Amino acid sequence: MEGNLIKINKWLYPVSWLYGTGVWLRNKLFDWGIYKERKFDVPIISVGNITVGGTGKTPHTEYLIRLLQKDYKVAVLSRGYKRKSKGFVLAGPDTSVQMIGDEPFQMKQKFPDIYMAVDRNRCHGIEQLCNSHIAPGTEVIILDDAFQHRYVKPGMNILLVDYHRLICEDALLPAGRMREPENGKSRAHIVIVTKCPKDITPMDLRVLSKQMELYPYQQLYFTTLAYGKLHPLFTVCLLYTSPSPRDRSLS
C-alpha cells in the first residue's frame, strides 16, 4: 500500500492542543450526561466524518437512500450549508437552491420521492419530520454530516474516513484536518474507508484494518468511487487547492 502524504503544520500543535482540550471537554459533558443526547422514536441514521474536507459523504448518503426507499419512506435532514433561508425548510416543487443549499437541492432533484429538509437545529428538524401534518409517513431519517452533533443520539452512526487521509495519520485542527480526537471514532457503529483505489490488494486491506484499531462492536468496510458514462463538458478552474476525486477523474 502506497503511503499517503498528509501535510501537518507542527508549528500549530500548541493551538491544536487548546482546540482538542475544548473538544474533549465538550464530549465528556455529553458522556457524563450534563449535556443531554436526545433519542427519537423514528429510526435515525447519521452519516458523517471527523475531518474537514470531502470524504465521499454525498454518494454514500445516496446509496443509503437507494437502499431504503424501496421499503421505507425516507427523509434526509441536512444543515443546508450556504443557504439563504433560516430555520426549518422542507423541500417542495417550488423550492430553490437558495432556500436549502446546493447538495440538498441536488439530492431532492435526484430523489423526488424522499422528504428533503434542512435545519441547523437537528432536534427541531427531526421533530418537524415526525409531524404527520408536515411530513406524513416518515419511517426513517438520514442525518447528513451530523457526527459531531451529539444533541441527537442516532440508532446508527456511520463514520466515513478518506483512504488518502486516514485519521490515524492526521492531526487536530489547525495543525491537521481533524475536528475531534481520533478516539471520537468510538461512537461509530460502522466505519467506511472511502475513495480506495480499485486495485487495492487483500494485504492492503489487512494493513488498513490493523491501522484503524476499531472496537469489537464496530464494522469496517472499504469503498471506491465508480464514475458513470463520460459526457462532453467544459470546465473552467478559477481557484485550485488540492485535487478532488472530480479533478482526478478529469485529468
What are the language-model segments listed below?
Residues 131, 233-239:
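Short, surface-exposed amphipathic charged segments that create phosphate/polyanion-binding patches used
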Residues 240-247:
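Conserved small/polar residues in nucleotide/adenosyl-binding loops
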